[in-house]
Structure formats: C-alpha cells, structure tokens
C-alpha cells in the first residue's frame, strides 16, 4: 500500500492550499483550489513555455482565471509550476531542462492525487500525450488548448543553427530556431506581442502586467519544441491513447496554431477538435485563459467534461 500517497491525499482533502510534488531532481510547486463534488474528477492545469501556473489563477487585467472557474464548477483544481518556473526550485543546469524531466515531475503529481483530468497548453501538450501513454491509470481525460503535438508529427530539423536559420517558415513550427543550451532563454516583449498577446481578445491595457509574468525558459525545451535533431518528445503509438477522451481547443487568431495543424494533431490522437469560430467564438489567440472571454471558453470545457461524465 502507498502509505505516503494515502497520507498526501488525506491532507489534500482537508483544505485549499499549496504543496510540493514532482521528482527528487525536479520538485514542483502546486496550488490547490476548490473541493471535489461527488462524481467529479480533479483537474490539473499545466502552463506552457515561458509561463507559470499564475496564468490560470488570474487574468492579466485582474479577473478570476480558469482555476477558480473550474473550482466553482465543483472540482478540485491543481495548478503546478514546471520545474525551475515560478515557485518551483531552479537548478543550476536549468538551461538543459528537458520535456521528459518536466513530464516526469507532472506524472509524479498525478500519481499522488489519483486519476485526474489533465488540461495542458502549448508546450505542455507533448508532455500530456507522453504521460497518458506512460501512466494511463493516472489520466482520465486530456484537454489540450492550442497544444503542441507529439514530435511524431514534426519534421526532424538539423542540429545546426545556421542550417535551421535557412529553413523556410513551417506553419506547424512557427519560425524554427536552434539555440545554444549554455544559458536560459529570455523571451523578448516583441515575441510576446506577436505570438501570445496579438489577438483582439487579449487585454492590451494589461500587457505590461502580462509581460512581467513571463519567465526565462530552458533552451533545451525550445530545441525540443522544434524537434531539433529529432529530440522532441514522442509517443510510441497513438493507439495507446485511443480510449482516452481528448479535446483539443483552438482559436482563429493564434499565428502558431492554424486550424490545419491542430486538426491534424486531433486526427492523429483520435481527439475531438473544437475550432472556436464554429462554436460562434471568434478572435481568440494563443492565450485564451487570459483573454476577455476566458470565462466563456472555460464554460465550454466544463460542459465537455460534464457531457463525458468526468
């Protein structure tokens, strides 16, 4: 019997708060909100690259975020910070932190709290597919918000910065780059505006507050995101996820997630695909949890979970 896990679950059942989970090498800080209602599974909200779990707690313009919205719907909500992000300890070798190492820490959290819905965004997408294959008993469903697909779907790019720089822009990759892994990657405000805060739905008056929330990123993670040298996070067989409820949600103003790309990811994984304009929801970019209709999209996700009996 896993006495440590049972003790953790008993402690978590008492009150909202925070705790640390993850692996010994890569601990993660986790916020916990809400209390479970009968029959409703907990949900784990995982941020993407350059962000922390704070993007789910409040919006840049100060409104309640997705975490409280899901808590109000009657679920326990767990919001981790990736290793080296936010309040999770940063190791000296942070620049070489890999997708697999982050995924292993998230997997440990899921093992501690029991089966849960895993909601992922952007660069945490490949981690979700990997975790679901490695530890299927811990993942009851996956919601991917503009998620990265498994590296199985990406071309293998050369492990050479000059060669990568000569490649044409690929809509499935954005503008590929190969970065040196000797220091963390600092994301410039120009990139944030062009790719994360570009939509008409983003609260532009709060851009400076959003900019201050962005954190340095692992250089290795960036190289894996572009599948440099074929080192992106892959799954063994999409059939291993065939019985898992998966929802992929994408907006029409996300420059790095055009409809064709995320629809292809959904087909490969056997997922349901929601192109928001087909639901009468237009103008969303890469950060719908921050945008002015964030509550509307959270409600769409809640409705899908309830329709699935999760």
Regions found by a protein language model. Name each.
Residues 2-37:
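N-terminal cap/lid segment of alpha/beta-hydrolase-fold proteins
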Residues 47-60, 122-123, 252-253:
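Active-site glycine-rich loops that stabilize anionic/oxyanionic intermediates
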Residues 54, 80-96, 282-283:
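Glycine-rich "HGGG/HGxG" loop immediately N-terminal to the catalytic nucleophile
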Residues 61-90:
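Conserved alpha/beta-hydrolase
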Residues 100-117:
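Conserved acidic catalytic loop of the alpha/beta-hydrolase fold
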Residues 115-156:
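Conserved hydrolase catalytic core segment
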Residues 159-261, 271-275:
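Alpha/beta-hydrolase
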Residues 279-294:
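Catalytic histidine-centered segment of alpha/beta-hydrolase-like enzymes
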